[in-house]
Swiss-Prot record:
Subcellular localization, as worded in the UniProt entry: Membrane
Name of the protein this chain belongs to: Interleukin-1 receptor-like 2
Ig-like C2-type domain ranges (all copies): 22-113, 128-215, 225-321
Gene behind this protein: Il1rl2
Reported function: Receptor for interleukin-36 (IL36A, IL36B and IL36G). After binding to interleukin-36 associates with the coreceptor IL1RAP to form the interleukin-36 receptor complex which mediates interleukin-36-dependent activation of NF-kappa-B, MAPK and other pathways. The IL-36 signaling system is thought to be present in epithelial barriers and to take part in local inflammatory response; it is similar to the IL-1 system. Seems to be involved in skin inflammatory response by induction of the IL-23/IL-17/IL-22 pathway. Receptor for the interleukin IL36G.
UniProt entry keywords in alphabetical sequence: Disulfide bond, Glycoprotein, Hydrolase, Immunoglobulin domain, Membrane, NAD, Receptor, Repeat, Signal, Transmembrane, Transmembrane helix
Pfam families given in the database record: Ig_2, TIR
Active site: 470
Major enzyme class: hydrolase
Source superkingdom: Eukaryota
Organism this protein belongs to: Rattus norvegicus (Rat)
Glycosylation sites: 23, 43, 55, 111, 130, 231, 237, 253, 269, 290, 302
Assembly information from the UniProt record: Interacts with IL1RAP; the association is enhanced by IL36B indicative for an functional signaling complex and inhibited by IL36RN.
Disulfide bond sites: 44-97, 149-199, 252-319
Length: 561
């Protein structure tokens, strides 16, 4: 009598109920008889609805409390599986899996019977029970064949160290037997090779170790001419990595004799694929093809997954050819670390570009905020007396020099000295009477941290620099030898610097310029306006407290007389 595969949830539709019970539809009840002490899994899937967008819970009737999802608990839910690590006699009972989606609810039940079975104790009364972990397999007399150890567990369980037994004795590699993992190859089969076999495997789950056993009742069978057992060359009980939602076609290649009329097909849960997915045809068997060779025929029958869904993973799809069978198990691909790496680098690059853009756009405000938040009142130890040396054009009388004087001698000190706390040396205001121009520039510029130069389009306004070589040398020394930072302010937009002194051209080329907007209103005399923010940005960090607020200066434009 054929036995259902070990630990495999969709073995057969044992008891189709399809009776509405409350708000859920009972799909079927499956009967399992397992010996105590065994790890036991059961996978709950119902292809019409378990498409990844469902809520799935296990509970033991009559309790409505869900089975724990804590993987350290002996009985727990692992995704769609219920896992017993291991089974105990008191676990006998009915367990229900409830599958809900947005529009429907289904129940699948297992009637679990746990009994005591002693390993290699044939005298025990219960040892003759046909349990779910006992299989019946056939071997062909006079040929070579193989036995299969069926092990289906969730991915959280690691299986290794598979051993084979005949009776109670472990099978070692010999001319007769060749254990190869889940397969036991048997050569020169005769009647004496029938009997009781078993396979055991070590199961590791979260560091805990268990032993899984399958019991196999083997019968031998005479096969004459035309009765050769088909050989499935692919699949080989292997796994296939496939993306969720993709299309997949898998060929089953079978070699068989020309006289054999064996049925070749794909099954899932011991049901023909086309019958199992009759309503949706998402997974279907293809048309069989064959190729005649000298001594045999190569048959190919494929299975097509139009769309791979979550319930397909970890679920065996088996190709059958008479007594031969081989399965595939679909697995989700391992994470593509290259994609994560490229994505991470792209995100980092985007972040870096964004930070650079934000900094370049708001760097003036960022720097000024940082200075105001983390400022220090301690004077720098650089032996400098002034924060900036102000050099501006001298206009002849009866000219527009009144506006320049107002900016330099009134507004500039008002904003930078009184509001911001800087100390300025203004050429034309702070030198001692009778000092030579070259001496003033050369001596005092060395006591300043910045050089602030104001320029206007009129080249004649800089005649004091253009015609006096010593003054140009003093400014040039400050720029080149002392490495002083320069703030160049255009009183009006200067389109052509070619007529300017070489020192001014050098400053413009190396440091750029800030353009004064010509606004003399009281609002423009605030340190928080755009122009003054740019000036403060180029100034050194403020070292002195600002003066108390004073009334801002008004400006009366000069009326030509």
């Amino acid at each position: 009598m054929g036995m259902p595969p070990l630990l495999f949830c969709w073995v057969s539709f044992v008891l189709p109920l399809f009776v509405a019970a409350g708000n859920c539809t009972d799909v079927y009840m499956h009967h399992e008889m397992i010996s105590e002490g065994q790890p036991f899994p059961f996978n709950c899937t119902y292809p019409p609805v378990t498409n990844g967008a469902v809520n799935l819970t296990w509970h033991r009737t009559p309790s409505k409390s869900p089975i724990s999802i804590n993987r350290h608990v002996r009985i727990h839910q692992d995704q769609s599986w219920i896992l017993f690590l291991p089974l105990a006699l008191e676990d006998s009972g009915i367990y229900q899996c409830v599958i809900k989606d947005a529009h429907s609810c289904y129940r699948i039940a297992i009637n679990l019977t746990v009994f005591r079975k002693h390993w290699c104790d044939s005298s025990n009364e219960e040892s003759s029970i046909n349990s779910s972990d006992e299989y019946q397999q056939w071997l062909p007399i006079g040929k070579s064949g193989s036995l299969t150890c069926h092990l289906y567990f969730p991915e959280s369980c690691v299986l290794d160290s598979i051993k084979w037994y005949k009776g109670c004795e472990e099978i070692k590699v010999s001319k007769k037997f060749c254990p190869t993992g889940t397969k036991l190859l048997v050569n020169n089969i005769d009647v004496e090779d029938s009997g009781s076999y078993a396979c055991s495997a070590r199961l590791t789950h979260l560091g805990r170790i268990f032993t899984v056993r399958n019991y196999i009742a083997v019968n031998t069978k005479e096969v004459g001419s035309g009765g050769r057992i088909p050989n499935i060359t692919y699949p080989k009980n292997n796994s296939i990595e496939v993306q969720l939602g993709s299309t997949l076609i898998v060929d089953c290649n079978i070699t068989d004799t020309k006289e054999n009329t064996n049925l070749r097909c794909w099954r899932v849960n011991n049901t023909l694929v086309d019958d199992y997915y009759n309503d949706f045809k998402r997974i279907q068997e293809g048309i069989e093809t064959n190729l005649s060779l000298r001594n045999h025929i190569l048959y190919t029958v494929n299975i097509t997954f139009l769309e791979v869904k979550m319930e397909d993973y970890g679920h065996p799809f088996t190709c059958h050819a008479a007594v031969s069978a081989a399965y595939i198990i679909l697995k989700r691909p391992a994470p593509d670390f290259r994609a994560y790496l490229i994505g991470g680098l792209m995100a980092f690059l985007l972040l870096a570009v964004s930070i650079l853009y934000i900094y370049n756009t708001f760097k003036v405000d960022i720097v000024l905020w940082y200075r105001s938040t983390f400022h220090t009142a301690q004077a720098p130890d650089d032996e400098k007396l002034y924060d900036a040396y102000v050099l501006y054009p001298k206009y002849p009388r009866e000219s527009q020099g009144h506006d320049v004087d107002t900016l330099v001698l009134k507004i500039l000190p008002e904003v930078l000295e009184k509001q911001c706390g800087y100390k300025l040396f203004i050429f034309g205001r702070d030198e001692f009477p009778g000092q030579a121009v070259a001496s003033v520039i050369d001596e005092n510029i060395k006591l300043c941290r910045r050089l602030m130069v104001l320029v206007a389009p009129e080249t004649s306004s800089f005649s004091f620099l253009k015609n006096l070589t010593e003054e140009q040398i003093a400014v040039y020394n400050a720029l080149v030898q002392d490495g002083m930072k320069v703030i160049l302010i255009e009183l009006e937009r200067v389109k052509d610097y070619s007529t300017m002194p070489e020192s001014i051209q050098y400053i413009r080329q190396k440091h750029g310029a800030i353009q004064w907007d010509g606004d003399f209103t009281e609002q423009a005399q605030c340190a928080k306006t755009k122009f003054w923010k740019k000036v403060r940005y180029h100034m050194p960090p403020r070292r002195y407290p600002a003066s108390p607020p004073v009334q801002l200066l008004g400006h009366t434009p000069r009326i030509p007389g």
